[in-house]
């Protein structure tokens, strides 16, 4: 049985249409996840990112130091983030981030992990979508550039966000 990772690797690390309507890049491993995140930070020029995060998973994969550097780089670019986090409890580092959310240019909603189980982190800054699956055994990231997809994922984020904002 062939899995998705093998199929993607077999065809290419990058898929794009001739008209440039979509670009999909696959990044494998911890270093690949970091590289995809760095590309997203560089290319996604919007001033507000909308994200679904499971920081515990990312924290376990790359550590708090690397994650903190990334947050600082985002803040240096003056990019705000609207973050939806499914959790009841957090590590001391995440508690500190939540406590100092204004410093980190964050708006955060905590949601039930039972109602909104997130196995992946998703960041949207049109036309970009970054998807990170940070499982220890086989972490990977997909970096997708496609306006209709980013608008759709952003709409889903807005629906969840607005549910808790009202």
List each language-model region with its residue ranges.
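Charged, low-complexity, helix-prone segments enriched in Lys/Glu/Asp/Gln
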Residues: 1-4, 81, 101, 150-160
């Amino acid at each position: 049985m062939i899995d998705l990772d093998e199929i993607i690797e077999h065809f290419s690390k990058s898929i794009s249409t001739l008209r440039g309507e979509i670009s999909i890049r696959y990044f494998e491993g911890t270093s690949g996840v970091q590289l995809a995140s760095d590309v997203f930070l560089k290319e996604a020029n919007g001033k507000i990112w909308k994200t679904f995060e499971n920081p515990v998973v990312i924290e376990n994969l790359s550590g708090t130091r690397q994650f903190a550097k990334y947050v600082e780089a985002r803040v240096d670019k003056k990019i705000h983030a609207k973050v939806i986090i499914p959790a009841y409890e957090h590590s001391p580092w995440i508690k500190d981030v939540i406590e100092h959310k204004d410093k980190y240019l964050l708006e955060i909603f905590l949601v039930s992990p039972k109602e909104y189980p997130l196995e992946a982190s998703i960041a949207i800054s049109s036309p970009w979508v970054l998807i990170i699956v940070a499982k220890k055994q086989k972490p990977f990231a997909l970096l997708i550039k496609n306006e209709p997809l980013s608008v759709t994922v952003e709409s889903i984020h807005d629906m969840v966000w607005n549910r808790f904002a009202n």
